């Protein structure tokens, strides 16, 4: 095992927060969320600690998105092992999954219908917080600030249930979309992670189903 970088207590706290957020919601926290959780006066304080973690090779920061934080799997795994901590993190080489890649989904037909499957990919199962059932090719930039870009492959666990704040694949009428779920009483909203896109409000009686839960992301460049 390679030596782990030495982290300050605050850096370790932030790393644990990032891992917990990814395991719980499928996405890393924003700088503002880190600041609020840890009592910082501003998001800039969180940014300084994130930059320090990046310099130590623990995370990678992706510019242009508020949730652009990627864990460096091997380094983080070594840190956790040294502390006896357990998080569901990438552990390369332990397992492989063959997943169908779903392209465009025709209105009214199941997502995993054969005609929607463009091809299959074999990927590390340990890349994901929970076992996915398929990959969905992302189209558009409505989830940019969650680090989900046009052309990325979203790992999806098929389920009809999701908690507030989780990123879901939803069928609304004839359309399939990736958004963050927000329920307020009986009201349902599908939130983009890009201010250029509107909030989608599900009207009473409008056909709506949760098709799956985002459990990971693969950059399309990783598979080229």
Swiss-Prot record:
The keyword Chaperone does not apply. Gene3D superfamilies: Umud Fragment, subunit A (2.10.109.10), Winged helix-like DNA-binding domain superfamily/Winged helix DNA-binding domain (1.10.10.10). One of its GO terms (biological process) is proteolysis. The active site is at residues 142, 179. Pfam families: LexA_DNA_bind (PF01726), Peptidase_S24 (PF00717). InterPro entries: LexA, LexA-like, LexA/Signal_pep-like_sf, LexA_DNA-bd_dom, LexA_repressor, Peptidase_S24_LexA, Peptidase_S24_S26A/B/C, WH-like_DNA-bd_sf. GO terms for molecular function: DNA binding; serine-type endopeptidase activity. Its EC number is 3.4.21.88. CDD domains: S24_LexA-like (cd06529). Keywords: Autocatalytic cleavage, DNA damage, DNA repair, DNA replication, DNA-binding, Hydrolase, Repressor, SOS response, Transcription, Transcription regulation. Belongs to the peptidase S24 family. Homodimer. HAMAP family: LexA. This is LexA repressor. It comes from Acidovorax ebreus (strain TPSY) (Diaphorobacter sp. (strain TPSY)). The gene is lexA.
């Amino acid at each position: 095992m390679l030596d782990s970088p030495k982290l300050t207590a605050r850096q370790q706290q932030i790393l644990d927060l990032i891992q917990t957020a990814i395991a719980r919601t499928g996405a890393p926290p924003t700088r503002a969320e880190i600041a609020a959780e840890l009592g910082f006066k501003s998001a800039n304080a969180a940014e300084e600690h994130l930059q320090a973690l990046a310099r130590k090779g623990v995370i990678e920061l992706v510019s242009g998105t508020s949730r652009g934080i990627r864990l460096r799997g091997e380094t983080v795994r070594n840190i956790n092992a040294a502390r006896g901590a357990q998080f569901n993190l990438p552990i390369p080489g332990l397992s492989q999954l063959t997943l169908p890649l779903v392209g465009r989904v025709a209105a009214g037909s199941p997502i995993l219908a054969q005609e929607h499957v463009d091809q299959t990919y074999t990927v590390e199962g340990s890349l994901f917080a929970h076992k996915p059932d398929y990959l969905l090719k992302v189209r558009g930039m409505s989830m940019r600030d969650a680090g989900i870009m046009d052309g990325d492959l979203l790992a999806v666990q098929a389920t009809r249930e999701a908690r507030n704040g989780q990123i879901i694949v939803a069928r609304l009428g004839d359309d399939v979309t990736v958004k963050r779920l927000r329920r307020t009483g009986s009201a349902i909203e599908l939130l983009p992670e890009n201010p250029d896109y509107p909030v989608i409000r599900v009207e009473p009686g409008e056909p709506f189903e949760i098709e799956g839960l985002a459990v990971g992301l693969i950059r399309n460049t990783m598979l080229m």
